[in-house]
Structure formats: structure tokens, C-alpha cells
Regions:
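Glycan-recognition and catalytic cores of secretory/periplasmic carbohydrate-active enzymes
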Residues: 19-414
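Substrate-binding cleft and catalytic face of glycoside hydrolase catalytic domains
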Residues: 112-117, 597, 630-786
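Aromatic/acidic polysaccharide-binding cleft in carbohydrate-active enzymes
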Residues: 376, 826-901, 914-919
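C-terminal beta-sandwich/jelly-roll accessory domains of carbohydrate-active enzymes
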Residues: 940-1004
Length: 1004
């Protein structure tokens, strides 16, 4: 028994050590990438005359007349494309776009294909020989640019380069790829990139064709390309590999006869992980096993023979001896290769070597004074006077190291769904939701009980710190602080601090409600320190740090577990409780069958829209500019600042900002809604909202003509001074009273009277029926809906999506719009009207998934003309950083932004069509535009990863673009082929996937 305990302890310690080492590597390399490496390249290398400088010295000085290399520019394209794909920063995209555009326009040979090896400083061809190595990097960079941005031009250029390699370079008789050619692809006795005149097939070129084809296959999974990948892997397993020494063969002739005896340690360990990656992409398990075994052997050998005493990787060994020069790139590849070998074997020594190498790199290669990395060091670690930027020295090996480690070493954790009001709605295992709903409760058992819940509480707080979510929830008589920490793939750490704020004969509990849909047959076992819940497809265990009092109750058909925190509230008394929750359950990876019926077009979808109510003139423009620049916005809603207009007129800053916003939207070409919140004091009597919660204003019936004149004067001012004739007008949420409140009949009467007034003034502006605070108050629109004399003044029906969006209610709204033949608009779109009180929630993937689920359902069920996001400003912002809600770091898009960008890719004015899915945790919406042949399908996967088979697609469709957004993918795109109207597509866990026929070019 002692041996078992000892082994268990050692195993736990080993796992902890691996986790600590991995986290150091991940965080430190990422920090260097973002704070040193990428900034150096953005600040020092951009050539104002076009593209990038060909040479930058160690001190950061550019040599302006230096030639520009193809490899350098392709690697810049790749590095910043990958950076944008990982982090979504617009500055990275700008660099990537600049690099890709320059590469396509200048480096690609328009006559013979392939790429020029070198240009002069003005971008004209200088060295026109065709090196296959350079062509491979062109494919690599451009395919990554397409993957990150969706720019079809980059993919088309990459495919042409691929075609050139296959037609002119690929040796189909003896396999492999020839090294060098003249410009017109006639063969000549030219030196390859490694300087071997008689070597026509080289290891270096083949491994980089492998990496290029691997990336290309990830965005364009073609069977011919897959065959090429298998051939390349076979070559690296046989013709270019010595199984006796576990080294690669660097140089061969046409017939694969080896030339020379050089062992290149950096290339060996780089190839080890490139082969592993390629084999995984190919998807052949037998091949993958073979490759993995070879990769580990190559890594072990390279480390054994190539590391110096400091843990740095030496360059190479030849018959003349060891080359002890220390170059930057072998260090990067050694670190990735070690991490890859550790992942394949679990051998901690690989991770230890990676950390030692990184420790050396950051103290010797990273230039703390001038930024960037040194290219080469002497044997004793002193920098050599080699340029930081040159044909070969690029932000590729070192940036790729950081990208790979960020992806590979991200901790694999459960994902606990915590609402801002403290309720836990479940724990996700590999995306599968093990659902329950927790709540905090104060009251008496069997009597009145206050429960934490959405929009039930004031002054709640939500924050995240790493993997820990913290909520502070004030309730009557008590305040609760709850922390929830995702620990590993099955474990969550919970902690509660309950503090009594008053003397009450009541108690405080943490409760878990188990829905009957999954727990009707559950067995619940309560012990002093442990609660176990076992149901057919799930198991939950709670282990507490002290004995607890717990009971179960039946509540409305569900089971509820009450765990006592404070048995009685005595002011100042506190109680703490900690628990470890472990969860397990069925992951549903079954294939989803999705069928679309294009023969039954419904209502038109103009596109996604937004609210642009200016409330923060300092921050709003940053978000507005970004949104309008980076996604298609089809509909806009702005504020009429009535009270300010009435008091200060056209020169008031708020009036100007609002009017300028309206003009900007109208110039883009979208319909504009003008909505009013605050009336001037003379126009209304103070009253309460319809729910009695706060003040509102009831318009004075005796001042109707003055009210109408004031409102119309603003609309005329917009038309005359700003060129904007408002398409629609509304009082915001007048069903509730934010801030003008109507009864249903008053709303009807206002539409008729003000509608006629506008017509008499020659304004074409129509009224919104409703613009309700949520979907539940449908009856508010009934008087006008049933009054034919009101219909001619109604331009559209509008509701806000904050509450009540069940299928039955949504269909009522859809039916109402059809009844009077006007469009339906979701005037304010999102899920939580109180979220501005706890804005950290906007950056949560849970919030993003809930929001896009709602929008997908809205599109499918009630088919609105547009959904107008609340907002596309810094309020409820889709961006984070830049001081928005006190967030730090650069301004950057959140997962929510990329979700909405994908939805906004729906073809303009496409028609909603029926779509059904056999999996309940997938929501779907589909659109078609028959005249142009365009269509789109949007899928939200709320569960584990699975394959989806979509049928009913247009028979003429050959390929589609598939975009994926989730917590780690930002509208990442690939092309897939459609066969006979059917498409098979992978749906990652907790993801929003859009399948679109027309690939939109990036916004300019």
C-alpha cells in the first residue's frame, strides 16, 4: 500500500511539474511575441515606398536600398496572418494584408509562374531564378493569410503556386521536387538555396513544401493535395532519412543518391514536429503512428548530439567537425520539437530541455535594448554583427514557436458556465454541457425564499482572473462571494463566503437544481462531506472541506439540493465553504443531419445591423469605426436627443454627434431608424414605468401640437442639414417607459396622429409599431395592429430581444408583421439588458455563445428583416481593451465580434428558408438568394464536436467557404467541396459555423 501511495504522490508531483513548466513556456514566449518580437517588425521594417525593407541592422536601422527577398516577405505574410488568426488585432491584419498584397503584386512571376527570388528596393525583379524553396514559402504565407482573413485573392495565388510546383517542379517519375530552375523553368546547373550546386533534391526544400502543403490542405482539403502530402511524408521516412543515425539526409541528386555527410540538428528536430503535424492533417492513423515514432527518435538524437552545456542547440556537424555557431532558428525549432515529443511520450525530460533552451534564448538571443532577436551568437553567447532582418532572418521561427506553444500548451480544462448573478448553469466537458442550475438563496425553508437570478438583483459584480470566475451577490440580509475555478478536464474548485448583513430568522443556502430532462432517474447520495449525483448520462460529485448539512426537495418536477451556508442570519456572522466538483458524462459526437428546403423561401434578411446611440464621445468612435470597417452593417438606429435639441438646438455637441452618426450610416447606404429616449420636461408628466420599477414620462395630451412640431423639426433638421431623411421613427421601449411611456391605445393613437403630421410636413418617415422592451409585451401592439387606419403610417414592427424569445412568442411577432405586410425588425439585439452593470461578462465565451444562439433562432423562427445589435459602440462593446469598461491592453475584437461578423456575411437581401436538424443542441438558420445563386447556413454547436452532413444545397454549388468562431478561432476560414447538394463539415465544440457560397472580400 505504501508503494501505491508513493507512486501516486510522485505521479501527482510529476503532473504538477509538467503543468508549471508548460505554463512558464507558454506565457513567457507569448509575452516576448507580443511585447518584443511583433512590435519590432511593425515599427522597424515597414518600407513607406511599399512592402518591407530587405535589411535592418542590429540597432534597428533600415538599409533602404537593400534588395527584398521572397522568403523574407512570404514569412512576414505568414507570421502576421497567424498573429491575426490567433489574437484578432487589427494592426496584425494590416501588416498581413500589406505583406500579402505586396507579395502577390511583386514577387509572383505573371509570365512563367512561381516567384522571383529577389527584388530590388523598388520592387522590380532582381534575381529571377526560380527556387522551389521560395515558392513553398509563398504557398505557406498566402494560405495562412486566406485562413486568417478570408481573402480569396491570397488563396487563388497560393493555388497557382501549387499548380506551378506540381506541373513544373514535381518529379513524377522518381518522386520529390527539383530544387532550382531558370526563370522560365528550364533546368540549369544552378545552386540551390543551400549552396550545393550538384544537389537537385534537398531536405530543406522538401520539409518546407511539406509545411506549405499542410497549411494549404487545412484551407483547401483536396484529394490530390492529400496524395502529395503522403508522398512527401514517405520521402522523409525513406529517401531523406537515415534510420541508422536518425538524421535527415540533406542533399541528393535526381535519383536520390546522397551527397555529403552533414547532420543538421535544427532541421532534424524541426522536421520531427512538421511531420507529426502533417500526418495528423492527413488523417491516416497507421501513417500517424509511424511518423510519431520517427519524430521521437529524431528529437532524441538531435538533443543528445546537438545541445551544448547551456542547453542551446548547435548548428550542424560535418566531416570537418562540429559547427558551434549558435543561430536563432534552431533554438526555436528545438523548443517546439521538445514540446511535440513530450506530447507524444509524456516524458518530462523533453519539457525540461525546452525550458532550459528558452531560458538561454531569452537571456542571449532576445535584444532587450533595441528589440527583436539577434540572428547569430558566438560559441560563448556573444551577438555577431548580423542584420536582424535579411533574406533569411524573418519573424517566422521565433513567432511560430510562440504560436505553437500558445496552442499546444493551453491547459485543457472544463468550461464552467457562470452567470454574472452567480448561478452556474453547468460544466462543459469537451464542449458537452453537463447541465444543472445553481442558485444562492435566502429565506425560510417552506416559506418565502429569495433566489439569485437574471435581472433579480442589484449591484452584483462579476470578474474573471485567469481560470477563476468570481461573483459578488448582495441579497436581502446577506452577501455572497462565490469563486469558481476550472482546474482540469473534469474538476472545478468552488468556494463560498456568506456574510449576514442583518439579524433575520432566515437561512442562506447554495442550491443545485437538476432538470428532470436529464436527472429524472438520478440517484443522489448525501454524506457529511460528499454529495454524489448519478444519472444515466452524467455523474457529478461534490467533495467539501468540512461537514455540511444538505437536503433534497422536489420543485416543479425537478430535484433541488439545498446545502446550508448560514442556518440563521446574525448580522456580522460569516460562513465559508469550499468544494471540489468532479463531473463526467456522455459526449455526444454523433453526426448531425441537417436538411435545408430551398423551395420554400420565407422573408428577406437585409443583413445584420446595429445601434449607434452616442453615449461616450471619447470611446464610441473607436468601436464604431472598427465595426463599420470590418463587417457589413446593413441597418442602423440612432438617437434623437430630444431634450438637448429642444434646449440647445443644432449646435449642441450631442445633437451634432447624433446627426453625424445618422449621416454616416445613410451614406453607407443603410436604412436609418431615429429613436427618442428623453423628452424635454415641458413635454411630459413624470410617472412610473409600466412595471412600476422606475420613473418614466407620459406625454401631455394638451401639448400634442407643440410635441409634434418639436419632433418634426429635428427630423427636418436631419434632412436639410445632414441629408438624412429618417426611414423610421420610434419612442424607445414606450411599452415599458424608457423613457416615454404609452398605454397600448396611446401608442396606436400616436402612430396615427404623428404619422399624419409627418406626412403633412412632407416627410416620408414612417413609424415603428412597438419597438418594445422585449418580446413578452406583444399585446402592446395589438390596438394599432388591429386598426386599419394606423397601418399606412407603420413602416415596420419592432421588438427588443432582451427577454421572452421562446418559439411561440417569436412566431406571434412574425405573424403580426405578415398580417399587415410590413417587415419585422429586432430593434435591439442581445441577451442581458443589465450586463452593463458587470461588463466583464462581455468578454466571456459563454455570453458570446448565448448571444449567437439567440440570433440564429431569431433568424430561423421569426425571420426578421434585420437584427440591430445593442450596441456597435463602446456600450455593450464587441471590442475589449483600450480602456473600454476599464479594460487594459490594445483595442481588440472579442468572440462576440467574430460571431456577428460571420452572421453579417449572409448574402444581402437573402430569403430565410426552412432548416431542420436532428440534434437538439445545434441551432440552425439558412438563407438563399436564388437570383444570384448565393446562400448561407449558420450553425451553432452547443455541444461536443461532431460532423454535420447538410443536404438540400443547390445542385450547382461546387465549393463553399466555411467560417468557424469559438473561444480560440476568429472566423477562421477554409474551402470545402459540395457533392450532389450535400456537404460534410466538422463542427468544433461550442462553436458558431457559417457556410457561405460567396466569399466576401475584406472590408476596405
Amino acid at each position: 500500500m505504501k508503494k501505491i501511495v508513493t507512486l501516486t504522490v510522485l505521479l501527482v508531483l510529476a503532473i504538477a511539474a509538467s503543468a508549471d513548466t508548460a505554463e512558464i513556456l507558454r506565457t513567457e514566449t507569448t509575452k516576448n511575441l507580443k511585447e518584443n518580437l511583433l512590435p519590432f517588425w511593425m515599427e522597424k521594417t515597414v518600407d513607406p515606398q511599399g512592402g518591407f525593407y530587405g535589411v535592418v541592422l542590429n540597432d534597428g536601422k533600415a538599409i533602404e536600398n537593400a534588395p527584398k527577398g521572397a522568403v523574407l516577405n512570404a514569412r512576414i505574410t505568414w507570421s502576421f496572418s497567424r498573429a491575426y488568426r490567433q489574437d484578432g488585432l487589427e494592426v496584425y491584419k494590416q501588416m498581413a494584408d500589406r505583406a500579402a498584397d505586396y507579395y502577390i503584386r511583386h514577387f509572383i512571376d505573371p509570365v512563367y509562374g512561381g516567384v522571383f527570388w529577389q527584388l530590388d528596393c523598388e520592387g522590380h525583379p532582381k534575381e529571377t531564378t526560380k527556387q522551389t524553396y521560395a515558392c513553398a514559402f509563398g504557398i505557406y504565407g498566402l494560405a495562412e493569410h486566406f485562413r486568417a482573413t478570408g481573402d480569396r485573392r491570397s488563396l487563388e495565388a497560393a493555388l497557382k503556386l501549387y499548380q506551378t510546383l506540381e506541373e513544373k517542379v514535381h518529379d513524377k517519375g522518381e518522386a520529390g521536387y527539383i530544387e532550382s530552375f531558370q526563370r522560365d523553368y528550364t533546368k540549369a546547373p544552378l545552386k540551390g538555396v543551400d549552396g550545393q550546386a550538384n544537389a537537385s533534391k534537398t531536405m530543406n526544400t522538401h520539409i518546407h513544401i511539406l509545411e506549405a502543403y499542410t497549411t494549404l490542405y487545412q484551407v483547401w482539403p483536396d484529394e490530390g493535395l492529400k496524395k502529395n502530402l503522403k508522398e512527401l511524408l514517405g520521402i522523409l521516412q525513406t529517401k531523406l532519412y537515415n534510420p541508422r543515425t536518425n538524421h535527415l539526409i540533406l542533399y541528393c541528386d535526381d535519383h536520390w543518391n546522397p551527397i555529403g555527410e552533414i547532420d543538421s540538428y535544427g532541421h532534424d528536430i524541426e522536421t520531427s514536429w512538421l511531420m507529426t503535424e502533417a500526418a495528423a492533417v492527413v488523417g491516416d492513423p497507421v501513417l500517424k503512428k509511424q511518423v510519431d515514432e520517427q519524430a521521437v527518435k529524431m528529437a532524441r538524437t538531435a538533443l543528445k548530439e546537438g545541445l551544448n552545456a547551456d542547453g542551446a542547440m548547435l548548428y550542424e556537424k560535418s566531416p570537418e567537425g562540429m559547427n558551434r555557431r549558435l543561430a536563432w532558428w534552431p533554438q526555436c525549432e528545438a523548443i517546439i520539437g521538445c514540446v511535440n515529443a513530450w506530447q507524444l511520450t509524456g516524458d518530462q525530460s523533453f519539457l525540461d530541455v525546452a525550458l532550459k533552451n528558452w531560458t538561454y534564448v531569452k537571456s542571449h538571443f532576445v535584444d532587450q535594448a533595441h528589440g527583436g532577436w539577434f540572428k547569430d551568437l558566438t560559441e560563448d553567447g556573444q551577438p555577431l554583427n548580423a542584420p536582424k532582418v535579411s533574406d533569411w532572418n524573418c519573424p517566422y521561427h521565433n513567432s511560430r514557436m510562440a504560436f505553437e506553444l500558445a496552442e499546444r500548451l493551453a491547459p485543457a480544462l472544463v468550461h464552467t458556465e457562470v452567470m454574472a448573478w452567480s448561478n452556474i448553469t453547468g460544466v462543459r466537458l469537451e464542449g458537452e454541457l453537463i447541465d444543472f442550475e445553481s442558485s444562492l438563496r435566502v429565506g425560510t425553508m417552506g416559506g418565502e425564499m429569495e433566489k439569485s437570478g437574471r435581472e433579480k438583483l442589484q449591484h452584483i459584480r462579476y470578474t474573471r482572473d485567469g481560470h477563476t470566475q468570481k461573483t459578488i451577490t448582495p441579497m436581502h440580509g446577506a452577501e455572497f462571494t462565490q469563486t469558481v475555478t476550472d482546474m482540469d478536464q473534469q474538476t472545478v474548485a468552488l468556494h463560498w463566503l456568506a456574510e449576514a448583513k442583518a439579524d433575520l430568522d432566515e437561512g442562506a443556502w447554495f442550491c443545485m437544481t437538476l432538470p428532470s430532462s436529464h436527472y429524472a432517474k438520478a440517484k443522489i447520495n448525501i454524506q457529511k462531506r460528499k454529495i454524489t449525483i448519478i444519472a444515466p448520462e452524467r455523474k457529478i460529485t461534490l467533495s467539501f472541506d468540512r461537514p455540511v448539512t444538505a437536503i433534497t426537495k422536489d420543485e416543479e418536477g425537478d430535484k433541488a439540493i439545498y446545502i446550508t451556508l448560514l442556518p440563521t442570519l446574525k448580522k456580522g456572522s460569516t460562513a465559508e465553504l469550499a468544494a471540489t466538483m468532479t463531473v463526467d458524462g456522455m459526449r455526444h459526437h454523433e453526426t448531425a443531419e441537417i436538411a435545408i428546403d430551398l423551395t420554400k423561401p420565407g422573408r428577406v434578411f437585409a443583413g445584420f445591423g446595429g445601434n449607434f446611440r452616442i453615449q461616450n464621445p471619447a470611446k464610441d468612435p473607436l468601436v464604431i469605426d472598427y465595426c463599420l470597417r470590418n463587417m457589413r452593417v446593413a441597418f442602423g438606429r440612432v438617437e434623437m436627443p430630444w431634450a438637448v435639441w429642444d434646449m440647445q438646438g443644432a449646435e449642441a455637441p450631442h445633437v451634432k454627434h447624433s446627426a453625424e452618426m445618422a449621416r454616416r450610416l445613410k451614406e453607407i447606404g443603410m436604412p436609418v431608424i431615429v429613436s427618442c429616449w428623453f423628452p424635454p420636461s415641458w413635454a411630459g408628466d413624470q410617472t412610473t414605468r409600466s412595471d412600476g420599477t422606475a420613473r418614466a414620462f407620459h406625454l401631455k395630451s394638451t401639448g400634442q401640437q407643440r410635441i409634434f412640431a418639436s419632433l418634426a423639426s429635428y427630423l427636418e433638421f436631419l434632412k436639410k442639414d445632414y441629408g438624412v431623411e429618417a426611414d423610421y421613427f420610434s419612442f424607445n421601449e414606450s411599452d415599458l417607459g424608457i423613457d416615454v411611456v404609452f398605454t397600448p391605445q396611446e401608442h396606436c393613437d400616436f402612430i396615427k396622429a404623428f404619422g399624419q403630421y409627418l406626412a403633412d410636413r412632407g416627410l416620408k418617415t414612417l413609424l415603428l409599431l412597438g419597438d418594445n422592451s422585449d418580446a413578452t409585451t406583444f399585446d402592446f401592439i395589438l390596438p394599432a395592429l388591429h386598426d386599419p387606419t394606423a397601418h399606412k403610417y407603420i413602416g415596420a414592427i419592432s421588438f427588443h430581444s432582451w427577454r421572452g424569445c421562446d418559439d411561440v412568442t417569436l412566431k406571434k411577432w412574425a405573424d403580426a408583421s405578415r398580417e399587415i405586410n410590413v417587415p419585422l425588425i429586432v430593434g435591439e439585439g442581445s441577451t442581458d439588458a443589465a450586463a452593463h452593470q458587470y461588463p466583464s461578462i462581455f468578454n466571456e465565451s459563454t455570453f458570446a455563445l448565448y448571444e449567437i444562439n439567440l440570433y440564429t433562432r431569431l433568424c430561423a423562427v421569426c425571420q426578421p428583416w434585420s437584427i440591430l445589435q445593442w450596441q456597435l459602440t463602446s456600450d455593450y462593446s464587441l471590442l475589449w481593451g483600450g480602456g473600454i469598461y476599464q479594460s487594459t491592453g490594445p483595442l481588440r475584437p472579442t468572440q462576440r465580434f467574430f460571431n456577428l461578423k460571420q452572421l453579417a456575411m449572409t448574402p444581402e437581401n437573402a430569403f430565410a428558408v426552412p432548416v431542420v436538424c436532428n440534434k437538439e443542441n445545434i441551432n440552425a438558420a439558412a438563407f438563399t438568394k436564388k437570383a444570384s445563386g448565393e446562400w448561407a447556413v449558420h450553425l451553432v454547436n452547443n455541444g461536443a464536436s461532431c460532423e454535420a452532413v447538410i443536404s438540400g444545397l443547390p445542385a450547382g454549388t461546387k465549393e463553399v467557404a466555411v467560417y468557424v468562431t469559438n473561444s480560440h478561432s476568429h472566423a477562421e476560414v477554409r474551402l470545402l467541396k459540395v457533392t450532389d447538394g450535400r456537404l460534410s463539415v466538422q463542427l468544433p465544440a461550442e462553436s458558431f459555423v457559417s457556410i457561405i457560397t460567396a466569399i466576401l472580400q475584406p472590408c476596405k
